[in-house]
Design a protein with these regions (language model features):
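Nucleotide/pyrophosphate-binding catalytic subdomain
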Residues: 1-89
Length: 89
């Protein structure tokens, strides 16, 4: 019998500070110790997407979708990297 799979998504407020990221990492680590397989999805930290969009629109009134997608994905990648670092403890 296969182990259950749990998918958890943490929004910007949930990963908005280092303390919150540590809390999320602790939750994930505790659940993982039970043997459950997990998929974790994180958003950019609270307010980061808006900041990035504002920067883009300062430079271009009609930014290309490709560049916007790449720019905005950096917020999620930062959150994912910080969470991965927190999970190493």
């Amino acid at each position: 019998m296969s182990k259950p799979l749990v998918v958890q998504k943490y929004g910007g407020t949930s990963v908005g500070t280092m303390e919150r990221i540590e809390y999320v990492a602790d939750r994930i680590a505790k659940l993982r110790k039970t043997g459950i397989n997990m998929v974790i999805v994180v958003s950019a930290m609270a307010g980061e997407t808006d900041k990035l969009l504002k920067m883009a629109r300062t430079l271009s009134k009609n930014p290309e979708r490709r560049e916007i997608d790449m720019l905005l994905s950096s917020g999620e990648r930062i959150s994912a990297a910080l969470l991965a670092l927190a999970l190493q403890n």
